[in-house]
């Protein structure tokens, strides 16, 4: 992308993110947007371009056609900053991203607790392996630039919702082999997170008898993992498959299943599941990250 096009895109991006933040009434300032790939996006046949924002009938905002993946950075206030980081991966079935209710709203809450938050806008639609490359690259970039962000490089969690939870699980439970051509010095550091937050995941029960999907490897050397889902979610088996595999591997896992909530609630006011998980997650994060 030329310098001129990059400048224009950055202006569009600021308007995009700023508009989305206004929609969800985020009170903590975004400080930066960082593109993951300085040159060509690996395994992509699409040119870099601006994403598409749509609003559906229920008022939810979705972003798709992300061809130049990036993360948005949110800083806590100096007096509350705890030097820990959380990368948030919105869901959307690998077709779109629910960036407000599963991205910026969660970021706003986490920043209020003192965490530096990075909302990952990974490639969609239909780019699962590309999204995983984006995930690996984002972790490495953030860890490599830990001094810049004033965070501990060994205190980085990945939080994902729905398809984003599948992506988060892959980041901590796949082999550590880099899945793309090395770009720069950031790709010399570890791409593994230090903790996983798995929110109403999908795609994790693809193994025999609805067991853990084979691309995920459960060992006892895994990040501490928090899992949350509701029993009336049609894909709740994903949480059971993950928790069972982690239990058998004697990994550190905490599973919460509430009776009702459905799927895709994020931090929706009035949804009991949405109101329950922050209460459970806050002390867990404080202890395990």
Predicted regions located by residue number:
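Primarily recognizes the serine-hydrolase "nucleophile elbow" in alpha/beta-hydrolase
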Residues: 137-220
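N-terminal cap/lid segment of alpha/beta-hydrolase-fold proteins
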Residues: 30-80
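Short beta-strand element of the alpha/beta-hydrolase
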Residues: 82-91
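Short beta-strand/loop motif that positions the catalytic acidic residue
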Residues: 226-229
């Amino acid at each position: 992308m030329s310098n001129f096009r990059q400048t224009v895109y950055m202006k569009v991006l600021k308007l995009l993110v700023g508009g989305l933040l206004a929609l969800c009434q985020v009170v903590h300032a975004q400080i930066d947007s960082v593109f993951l790939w300085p040159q060509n996006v690996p395994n992509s046949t699409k040119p870099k371009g601006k994403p598409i924002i749509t609003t559906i009938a229920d008022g939810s905002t979705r972003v798709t056609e992300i061809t130049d993946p990036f993360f948005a950075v949110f800083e806590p206030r100096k007096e509350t900053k705890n030097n820990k980081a959380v990368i948030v991966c919105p869901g959307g079935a690998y077709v779109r991203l629910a960036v407000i209710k599963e991205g910026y709203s969660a970021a706003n809450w986490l920043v209020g607790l003192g965490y530096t938050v990075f909302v990952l806008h990974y490639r969609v639609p239909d780019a699962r392996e590309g999204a995983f490359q984006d995930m690996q690259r984002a972790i490495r970039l953030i860890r490599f630039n830990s001094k810049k962000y004033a965070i501990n490089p060994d205190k980085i969690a990945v939080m994902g919702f729905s398809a984003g939870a599948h992506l988060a699980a892959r980041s901590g439970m796949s082999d550590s082999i880099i899945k793309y051509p090395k770009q720069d010095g950031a790709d010399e550091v570890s791409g593994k997170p230090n903790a996983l937050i798995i929110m109403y995941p999908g795609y994790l029960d693809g193994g025999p008898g609805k067991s853990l999907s084979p691309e995920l490897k459960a060992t006892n050397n895994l990040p501490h993992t928090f899992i949350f889902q509701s029993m009336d979610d049609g894909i709740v088996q994903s949480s059971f498959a993950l928790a069972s595999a982690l239990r058998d591997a004697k990994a550190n896992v905490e599973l919460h299943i509430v009776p009702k909530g459905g799927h895709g609630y994020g931090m929706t006011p009035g949804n009991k599941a949405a109101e329950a998980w922050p209460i459970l997650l806050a002390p867990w994060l404080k202890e395990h990250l």
